[in-house]
Regions:
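Alpha-helical transmembrane segments and membrane-interface helix-loop junctions
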Residues: 1-159
């Protein structure tokens, strides 16, 4: 067995490392979201509500969703119809997989492009409860996660 087959090098090694990086990002977002919501609940319980905690929690949940989608792309964990695909011949299955990958890549290239074009428009807007944080930072998750998903899908396409 070669080093590339064991996940230690080459494209498979890169994909495994890429997946681990996204796992760390998703885990960190989950920990921060948990801590932030817990902090908000504690402060509310003692009668000193934080005005920003629900808005930040919403942003963190959105980020978790987008970065989690990128992680799911790396792990091939999105919902599919394997029974239908498995009923096809190997050649038809391969062709269908390639077409599906290309459609997903095209969609996320479009989403990333549109998401990036919106960022300058949002540069002057900010979170309501934290005006120091521009909406462009909040919404940057869209083009960033689109690029991450395109990378993941391209890794599977060349596999």
């Amino acid at each position: 067995m070669s080093e590339a087959d064991e996940g230690g090098g080459g494209l498979r090694g890169f994909r495994n490392g890429y997946g681990r990086l996204l796992e760390v990002v998703v885990a960190a977002l989950m920990i921060v979201l948990f801590a932030e919501v817990t902090l908000g609940v504690v402060f509310r319980a003692i009668g000193r509500s934080l005005i920003w905690y629900d808005e930040v929690a919403s942003v963190l949940l959105a980020w978790l969703t987008f970065y989690g989608a990128a992680l799911a792309s790396v792990k091939r964990a999105h919902i599919g119809c394997p029974e239908v695909v498995d009923a096809l011949s190997w050649r038809a299955r391969r062709a269908l997989n390639i077409v599906a990958e290309l459609l997903v890549i095209a969609f996320f290239v479009l989403l990333g492009g549109v998401g990036a074009s919106v960022l300058p428009v949002l540069a002057t807007d900010a979170l309501v409860s934290l005006p120091e944080i521009p909406m462009s930072v909040v919404q940057s998750v869209i083009p960033i996660s689109a690029v991450l998903i395109v990378i993941a899908e391209m890794l599977h396409l060349v596999d």
